[in-house]
Amino acid sequence: MSIPKLSRRQFLALSAATAGVAALGSRFVPLPQTITPAGAAEPSLSEGQWIPTCCHMCGGTSGILCNVVNGRVAKIKPNTDNPIGLANVSSDYWQHKSEGAAMCPKGNAGIFTLYDPDRVKKPLKRTNPEKGKGVDPKWKEISWDEALDEIAAKLKALRDNGEAHTLLWFTEDSSFTDIQADFCDLYGTPNYSMHSNLCDVSRKAIFKSVMGHDRPLGDTVNSKYILFFGWNPLSATKWSHLPRTITRGIENGARFIVVDPYCSFTASKAHEWIPIKPSTDGAMALAMANVIIESKLYDQKFVDDWAVGFDQFSAYVKDKTPEWAEKITGVPADTIRRIAREFATTKPAIVDAWSGPGQHSNAVQGGRAIAVLAALTGNVDKPGTIMIPNKGGGAHPPIRVKKTDKPRLDGLSKFPMGHSSGVYTEIISRILDGKGPYQPKMAVVMFQNLVLSIPGTNNVIEALKKLDYVVVDDIYLSETAEMADIVLPGSTYLERYEVIGQWVTWPVVSLRQPVVPPIFGQLPEYDVVIQLGKRLGLKDADGAPFFESLKYEDYISKMIQGGSAKITLEELKALPGAVWMDPKGTQYEKHLAEVKPPEGATVDPKTGSVKDKDGKLVGVKVGDKVHKGFATPTGKLEFFSESLASKKDINGNPIDGLPAYTPRDWYPDDKFPLFLINWKESHHTHSRTFNNPYLMEIQNWNRLAINDVTAGKLGIQDGDEIWVESPYGKAKAIARVTQGIHPEVVGWQHGFGHWGFGKVAKGKGTADGQFNVTKSDPISGMALHKEVCVKVYKA
């Protein structure tokens, strides 16, 4: 096995093919047929129009400007009127806006995705009934009306037979999917699922249980100590401003520590990288808490005023010493002790954790142990700490609908901190074992590649084969599309609308809008839904046709008017950069806002929680004042959660109200002695950007990182062809021998290993999902992308 490189000849051929795509139809003007020689002056871009929109090469929604000349996109650059790409705190944004914003490699490469010659251009119908990995579907091109009529007929037959609930719907977690959720409600299926379940629902559960908000954000610019567990924001950039804000924090004097089994790009830029065994982050955090409490370095006044359960937590960590944690984590006790003292005595400080600790079976409890370190030191919602964002956005237009009383297939309600995005692994498992409340019959998959995204690739393929009918809407013939009966050509983010509530610390609403019309005349996903709704005659609870006269522009205009901005779609378009932001900016310590409790309110003498006569929390009494508090059940930060303690996980096990450490379910043994982890980088998103030659030039293969000492013991050298084997899968890979990974761990970048998708993506690297178990965290339902052990040997 050798790693192929994209030659300049191949690159030019792809670019020429892209030009041909852009030339399709009389409306379109071809891209240049040649590549500008290196060093030549860039063609003038003064002509045409600069249209503001938001990127969607990943979920970060960076603000961008697209130069459209004669009907084609000629250039993409950052939009400085949008804070994503520049800052997440308003003062930093307004002070440094003139410096310009940033954009990651994916954003720059978006033009190729728009004009990729491998895009699906017309609806396709399967003519080969056999399904399986690598099986030729023998596609037949059909018209849009034929495709929509057939899909609607299948949906109508299900509904008329009383089986509407057997429809599965998978999609992205963006506002353009709200109308898809409406469709599912009106049609009668509870099985609407979104991408979040495959990404960060455990982190959402972690912080929601401790702080009451599921996505706090770090004010790194103003911090003096930044401690990250299992997060790579300088490369796996969720938001493109993160490298800048973290770097500016370091320039302002912050000490930067990264705890991670792998020396990621972020770890390589930190003052200190602390290699740790996967899934043991919670044990290190508990030992840090032990040191902070025993040394009386915690913020006693903040804890007394704004936390519950401290006494129970303090008693629990009494024996969780650094020496105890060293045996579990592999991190030296002296290092844990030193980091704990540095963190507690350097103010302000940030502690944060993402998918590293979050994609294991002990994710929520381990993550809670990390989150309570912020509460312990008073580093919450203050400048330079972990912030509770005052996020803005659109409001889902109200709809009157009588929802089905059928249960979800995935058992979401049995996950005590499950997320509305569903539980993908449970759907797959229940299709295969038949232990769900019913067997699903049909699936609609929009903008998702389930086969390479859900742990346990072979299980996903077998589950899709068991469905009677599968519809995929995508821009590529992905591995999931390969399993479909109908494939609809999808839209890119440059061809559709969406309202974006930006993930910054103050309310900001921006617009994703078409900068060119759909280049193949295809319907954007929301118009597909509208057309299906019309064909099915879907009505609301009052009997009024919901989709009959609906225009999506009107739908999102109502979203904008009902949300933070309170303006119309046209008014948002007219604002600089098509961005609205609250002029009040970032607000700190929002929990301190004083409130007037209603008449008849009562105060819990134990917690200070103030509730109205109906038992609803309305504030928190601290001293002689009633404050807004946090959005937890008690209104305070929770070291101990009575809510969790009263519940059981999906397996029927009682949940500890404390962030108790328990080992994850799968651990190395003699047969499979190495942890296997994965990660992401800035030049790719999940499994969906691998047909872009600009990005594949940066990295076109995911070699398996293995510690040099471990490799030496196994007789493996850098570049060797190797076998990777787990209890669930076996495949060849190429070794990357390095000092930058824990000796008991191997790992690689997620998303490679396509056998479909497109000419550039096909056959590059190894698909990591095939090695994993199709399971989820029992509390949050998070897919377990890192819960597997392997053996590695020379091929």
Predicted regions and their residues:
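Extended redox/cofactor-interaction regions of prokaryotic respiratory oxidoreductases
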Residues: 2, 180-246, 252-259, 266, ...
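N-terminal export/assembly segments and adjacent metallocofactor-ligating motifs
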Residues: 2-295, 319, 332, 531, ...
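N-terminal leader/propeptide and maturation segments of large enzyme subunits in energy/redox metabolism
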Residues: 122, 126-146, 297-333, 515-619, ...
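Flexible glycine/proline-enriched surface loops and loop-helix/loop-strand junctions
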Residues: 135, 229-231, 269-270, 319-324, ...
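Flexible, glycine/charged-enriched surface loops at secondary-structure junctions
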Residues: 162-166, 298-303, 350, 381-388, ...
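Glycine/threonine-rich phosphate-binding loop and adjacent beta-strand/alpha-helix elements that clamp
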Residues: 217, 494-518, 528-529, 533-538, ...
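Active-site phosphate/pyrophosphate-binding segments
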Residues: 288, 307-424
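Long, contiguous, secondary-structure-rich segments that constitute the structural scaffold
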Residues: 524-578, 687-705, 709-795
